């Protein structure tokens, strides 16, 4: 998948139609993947059909205001009405806002927006919006000037959220660092922005695939996987990071799950060799390649290198090793590497296409 072959005007009709198509593909895949077992066929068919029946119905659910919510930092925020002007200083929440169809309400987004392909593909106009800064240095002046009704911030900017509240700007902290927290984040943002029905459809789409994928790879071997970080092959994600969920959802085992760091952890070559993973998966935005690892003499004794089981996550659209709504597609991709007999490349590409057509309004190219 590389560039969009065409853009679509996103509307409710397209949303319902593409969501139904996306879910139908999930249903067909589940039935085909389990074709070797009659009992498995029946159970998977019933589960998938039930989910399809629910998810193909998109309900417009209104929110009553005033609305009081608790954000993912435990802060209480009250809204008198649905926000009309929205800012985001976190690419995770910005991508989510696009998935909820709120690009026209954005008045400011995080720094380096022009480096994110998803923005150029789904909503090119937002790239030129005022810069709200980074997770390390928030641009309070620009935010005040943009006068948003709400600004979404990462957990690292919790103190900034309190500062903004003192300036009269509603601030909501999000922290989607595992599958349940991502679901909670989608629900929270959907409720605040009066998009509950679409948020539910998004969550249901994600949950349906993950449930089906669990069925499809159950009973298979569980390969050990080392996830190499963006900065270096010697950085990785432990059990407290979303990337751990990415691997387990793909039917793999994170060799670094013993680590409890809440950010990328630095490890040694010796530690990687001791873990001796079956596969090495490189983060999407890494500045090095699979060939760099395959040619690294320090890793010559690693099973993943010996067997040439080293891959890099796609980054044509967005980094699926981050907790964006489409991150479950990263699990599909990894599953297609770990379990190619159960998760085909064609299915992976179809899921990517249907998901972005349904929730972001563009068709990726193959």
What does each model-identified segment do?
Residues 1-11:
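Short, Lys/Arg-enriched N-terminal segments with co-localized hydrophobic residues
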Residues 10, 17-18, 23, 33-95, ...:
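Bacterial Sec-exported substrate-binding components of ABC uptake systems
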Residues 72-74, 129-141, 260-269:
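Short helix-initiation/N-cap motifs at beta->coil->alpha
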Residues 76-78, 159-235, 256-258, 309-366:
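Extracytoplasmic substrate-binding proteins
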Residues 88-146, 150-152, 156, 255:
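A short, structured surface patch at a secondary-structure boundary
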Residues 132, 140-153, 169, 268-284:
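Proline-aspartate-enriched helix->loop->beta-strand connector
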Residues 236-264:
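Alpha-helical, coiled-coil/dimerization segments enriched in small aliphatic residues
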């Amino acid at each position: 998948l590389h560039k969009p072959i065409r853009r679509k005007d996103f509307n409710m009709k397209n949303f319902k139609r593409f969501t139904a198509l996306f879910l139908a593909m999930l249903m067909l895949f589940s039935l085909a993947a389990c074709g070797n077992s009659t009992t498995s066929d029946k159970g998977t068919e019933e589960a998938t059909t039930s989910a399809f029946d629910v998810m193909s119905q998109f309900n417009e659910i209104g929110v009553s205001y005033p609305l009081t919510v608790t954000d993912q930092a435990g802060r209480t925020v009250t809204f008198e009405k649905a926000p009309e002007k929205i800012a985001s200083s976190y690419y995770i929440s910005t991508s989510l806002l696009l998935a909820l169809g709120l690009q026209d309400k954005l008045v400011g987004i995080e720094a380096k927006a022009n480096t994110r392909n998803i923005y150029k593909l789904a909503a090119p106009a937002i790239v030129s919006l005022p810069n709200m800064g980074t997770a390390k240095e928030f641009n309070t002046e620009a935010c005040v000037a943009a006068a948003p009704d709400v600004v979404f911030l990462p957990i690292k900017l919790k103190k900034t959220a309190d500062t903004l509240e003192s300036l009269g700007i509603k601030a909501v902290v999000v922290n989607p660092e595992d599958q349940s927290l991502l679901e909670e984040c989608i629900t929270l943002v959907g409720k605040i922005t009066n998009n509950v029905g679409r948020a539910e459809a998004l969550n249901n789409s994600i949950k349906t695939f993950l449930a089906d994928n669990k069925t499809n790879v159950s009973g298979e071997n569980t390969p050990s996987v080392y996830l190499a970080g963006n900065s270096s092959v010697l950085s990785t994600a432990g059990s407290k990071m979303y990337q751990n969920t990415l691997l387990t959802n793909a039917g793999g085992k994170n060799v670094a799950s013993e680590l409890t760091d809440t950010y990328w952890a630095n490890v040694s070559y010796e530690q990687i060799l001791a873990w001796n993973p079956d596969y090495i998966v490189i983060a999407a935005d890494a500045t090095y390649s699979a060939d760099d690892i395959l040619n690294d003499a320090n890793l010559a004794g690693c099973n993943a290198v010996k067997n040439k089981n080293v891959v890099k996550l796609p980054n044509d659209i967005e980094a699926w090793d981050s907790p964006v709504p489409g991150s479950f597609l990263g699990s599909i991709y990894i599953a297609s590497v770990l379990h190619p007999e159960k998760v085909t490349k064609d299915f992976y590409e179809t899921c990517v296409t249907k998901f972005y057509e349904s929730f972001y309004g563009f068709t990726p190219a193959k």
